[in-house]
Amino acid sequence: GTRGSLPASITSNQIEMKLNKILELLSEKKSITYSDLKNIISTAQFSVSKAYGTNTSCVQIDDGNKENYIILDAGTGLRDFGNYIMKNTNIKINKTFHIFISHTHWDHIHGFPFFTPAYIPGNKIIIYGVHNELEKNFETQQSQPFFPISLKMMAAEKKFIQLSNKEKYNISGYEISIIEQNHPGKSYGYSFIKNGKKIVYSTDAEHKEEVIGSEFIEFFRNSDLMIFDAQYTLVDSEYIKCDWGHSSNFLA
């Protein structure tokens, strides 16, 4: 998921607009086959054939390991990921899930109560983060009157590990570095390196002029994939929503 603050599904009006555009493309052909239809849909521009957003922040780094999973943030996308694991793996237990939290604002953790593998005995959930009281924040989210099932009632083994942005770590074969980011309450970006490939996860971060060209450039340098907060237009990030803790595609 990539949606900020709240999950948002595609609306019926948006679906209708996409279908109308497909019909418009079809009308340009004198005759049409099923193969033509599939080709039109697959080659149509992104806004017509696909969608983005929907769930809040949750990203899997998939290196093919079906026993140890690397997950970045626990937004509502974690529910879909858990359902995928339950549907597509023959063995549902004895799996380890490493979940790295950028910060504990609600949209980055509120998928965890709906993560099915966390309810299965034999699974192990390790949650990493730099913020103090990481475990307490997860417990509070699942306390009465907010949620009926407490964190302790989830049957998988759960472990919380506090990291430091001053240290480097080796976890599940990844060399991991962390950087502090400008966001209300602070957020943290992560760099993952394995087999000569580098992924940077940097969400919920505002980059002002004074940090451009500083440690962030080195942190991002040589990334094979960079996941970057580009929520705002340049005008929003510089004026209307300055100091809200987010960035723009222009700065990316």
Model-found features: residue ranges?
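DG-centered beta-turn motif at the end of beta-strands
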Residues: 202-204
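Cap/insert and terminal regions of metallo-dependent hydrolase folds
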Residues: 45-47, 208-252
